[in-house]
Amino acid sequence: MFLRALLLSGLLAFSPLLTHAAPRTCLVVGISDGDTLTARCGRIGAYERVRVRIAAIDAPEKAQPYGQRSKQALSDLCFREQALITEIDTDRYGRTVADVSCNGEDVGSRMVSQGWAWVYDYNRLATKRGGGLFKLQDGARAKRLGLWADARPTPPWDWRKRQRAQQPHWGGFF
């Protein structure tokens, strides 16, 4: 009996680590780019600003072709709107990685289906969810929507790698 109680208390102690956080309703107060927003969550007098990276997508960077249009598409969908934010993880920049819905619509799905973001299968999240985002991406590509109007658009992860390679390296002399 004691062992069972000990095991149960251990599971309860770690259960928050095993599940996603409960969804939060927040107000979107800023758009950084096509896959990152800032939301104000909480109640009057106890607001918290949260930077949110939308899960399973990667949008063009602001200085990249289609970056500004991607940012505008996310703004049109979510800016000054209530968003349902379901936290999944925290990225290396301290942003909350989350599923986001605005006006009852999944934001990641919308951005991919309109051609403003690529599927980003970090930790195989998109694959584990059944691959629906990949089908939406294939549809946007076939219709040449958004960034798919280019014959060979550069994915943001390749663009960032090129940008880093072009940065001057001072070799620690200064």
Regions found by a protein language model. Name each.
Residues F2, L7, L11-F174:
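Small beta-barrel nucleic-acid-binding modules, primarily SNase/OB-fold domains
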